Design a protein with these regions (language model features):
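Cell-envelope/extracellular polymer assembly enzymes that use nucleotide-activated donors
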Residues: 59-62, 91
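Acidic donor-binding segment of Leloir-type glycosyltransferases
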Residues: 79-125
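Long helical/loop segments within the catalytic core of UDP-sugar-dependent glycosyltransferases
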Residues: 112, 118-125, 130, 134, ...
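Short aromatic/hydrophobic "clamp" motif used to bind/position activated sugar donors
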Residues: 135, 147
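Acidic donor-binding/catalytic loop of UDP-sugar-dependent glycosyltransferases
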Residues: 151-167
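Catalytic donor/gating beta->alpha subdomain of glycosyltransferases that bind UDP-sugars
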Residues: 169, 175-197, 226, 232-297
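Membrane-embedded multi-pass helical conduit in multi-pass membrane proteins
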Residues: 305-387
Length: 394
């Protein structure tokens, strides 16, 4: 067997190397998540948690929860909110729909708790997003400057969750975004996608202005919510409550991101329908959000370079075998192995920084799957009736 080293092989090998390097340098996982520290540390001697950082001027907070036909989840997670260890006044405002008898029964169990306040929305309220209406009613019931929006399908991992979020509520800030992980019962690819998206948004926030909120915890100022007339600018869209708030309210240097262990929520595994709808509704919502083109270009570039490099490597192996350019074949195989190994290590390192446990053997395949996953949902979205994404048909 003759080893052929010709000009075409050298040029092709150089192009392959450049493609692999470019794909690696644009990998979202290359910059791992920067974790915020837990606000408290445990002392083994006396089992008492004390402040490990300078004292914070914790503000009074109203936590708004908007369950709809989720009495079981409310019963499981409401006690975790009511038992938060927080040095300032706080109140849990639960907004539910009149006629939800199971939710009403759950609230009666905790009615004696001074931190709980419940109100309802009449059945006659129509023609707008249930969630947006419930949040607006909760805001009207609040008496504090800082509001904390969260979902009943999520639970705090610690009784110091509220401390972790509220320590960022300083004079110069107007938004605090909290990280949310899926629980271990959630399929691995969904957990991978949540981590990928959250990390991408963190990096975007670090470079300037937050684009949207992927998680289920968002702090904002009540005065600003009222000044901007709440959801008036996006009232007709059924979903995207947190996304629209962040997209409209965020400004450089005024948004904090909380992702410590204490400050991270754990979300129950969503149903297949809820999972599909979340992405489909986001595809509609982003058409009406600012900075969408700037938000998408890094993801599109990274995915394009990844797939282009893999296709080029596989094509080089095939072409080299057909033309007996065995040096080119060996070089392409080496670069392909290096790509898989290096990207797996980079991804595993980033996921571990987010407390996300994934099998290393699947990570490269998950990265490759992202493009096809989004393309499949693009097809679903373009086939969907666009009136399904709004509250009043136009």
């Amino acid at each position: 067997m003759t080893l052929i080293i010709d000009t075409a092989s050298l040029i092709g090998g150089g192009i392959l190397l450049l493609l692999v390097l470019a794909a690696t340098l644009t990998d979202v996982f290359l910059r791992k998540s920067r974790r915020t520290e837990n606000p408290l540390v445990a002392h083994e001697a006396d089992k008492i948690k004390e402040m490990a950082e300078p004292s914070y001027d914790y503000p009074p907070v109203s936590i708004i929860v908007t369950p709809h036909d989720k009495a079981y989840e409310l019963d499981q997670h409401l006690p975790l909110l009511l038992e938060q260890d927080y040095p300032a006044p706080f109140r849990i405002i639960v907004v539910f729909w009149r006629g939800e008898s199971e939710t009403d029964e759950v609230l009666k169990k905790y009615a004696a708790n001074p931190h709980l306040y419940a109100t309802y929305i009449p059945d006659s309220s129509r023609y707008m997003s249930r969630k947006k209406l419930a949040i607006t009613v909760g805001e009207k019931a609040a008496t504090t400057e800082w509001l904390l929006l969260t979902d009943v399908t999520c639970r705090p991992q610690s009784k110091y969750w509220l401390r972790a979020m509220a320590r960022h509520a300083t004079q110069e800030r107007n938004l605090v975004i909290g990280h949310t992980r899926f629980d271990d019962d959630t399929p691995p690819f969904r957990r991978f996608l949540r981590s990928y998206t959250s990390l991408y948004l963190q990096q975007e926030l670090a470079r300037g202005t937050a684009y949207r909120c992927e998680g289920n915890a968002l702090m904002l100022r009540r005065s600003e919510f009222e000044k901007r007339d709440g959801f008036r600018a996006n009232l007709k869209y059924l979903r995207g409550e947190y996304d629209f708030i962040v997209n409209e309210y965020a400004r450089p240097g005024a948004t904090a991101f909380e992702n410590s262990e204490d400050g991270t929520l754990l979300e129950l595994c969503p149903t297949d329908k809820a999972w599909r709808n979340k992405l489909l509704y986001y595809m509609e919502d982003r058409r009406h959000m600012a900075r969408t083109a700037a938000h998408r270009w890094r993801h599109n570039l990274a995915q394009t370079l990844l797939h282009l490099s893999v296709v080029a490597l596989l094509a080089s192996v095939l072409l080299g075998c057909l033309t007996a350019r065995w040096i080119l074949v060996a070089w392409a195989v080496l670069l392909l192995a290096a790509t898989v190994g290096l990207r797996t290590w980079i991804c595993l390192r980033a996921l571990r920084s987010m407390d996300e446990d994934q099998p290393a053997s699947r990570l490269f395949l998950y990265e490759m799957r992202l493009l096809w996953h989004y393309l499949a949902f693009h097809v679903r979205y373009h086939r969907a009736n666009k009136d399904d994404f709004i509250t009043h048909k136009i």
